[in-house]
Amino acid sequence: MWKKVAMVALFFMISALLSMPGGAVEKDYGKHPWVVNIEDMTVKNEYFRAAKWTGQYLQMTVMSLKPGEEIGLEKHDQGDQFIRVEKGNARVVMGLSKDKMTFDKKVSDDWAIFIPSGFWHNIINEGDKPLKVYVIYAPPEHPAGTLHRTSKESEAVHGH
């Protein structure tokens, strides 16, 4: 009898954890084969940044930016970056100098952004709803398992 009660309780606890914002996004599945519905996972994510898969040469994170929030002006000298907008409206700016952004485009659902190594860039949520994106870095940019619940938490770690 008690075993049955314990199993039911365990089932409900696991269900509750998986139904939390973003589903169990705290886990990084890297270094193991993994298959995922990337759109569903990205749209459900409510954290500013969560590393979902970190391998030796590649990393995938999901991000959620509140209206008016931005990723922050940054540059990666050691690798390229790919960003896909799953949901929302954003402005993308890029340039070889942080003082001279020569690339300025508006993007929305289903758009892809390719950022070459050495380019300063920023993504700004210009919509009135959260911007949901996934990001692929080659090589990895963040430590495996990185989780930034808010942009302020990310700024404290990265300075942007």
Task: Specify the residue positions occupied by each region the protein language model found.
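Sec-dependent N-terminal signal peptides
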Residues: 5-13
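A generic "binding-loop/recognition-motif" signal
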Residues: 58, 67, 78, 119-120, ...
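Short hydrophobic/aromatic-rich beta-strand segments that constitute the beta-sheet cores
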Residues: 60-62, 92-94, 133
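Histidine-centered metal-chelating micro-motifs
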Residues: 70-72, 91, 111-113, 117-123
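Glycine- and acidic-residue-biased ligand/ion/polar-headgroup-sensing regions
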Residues: 78-91, 95-96
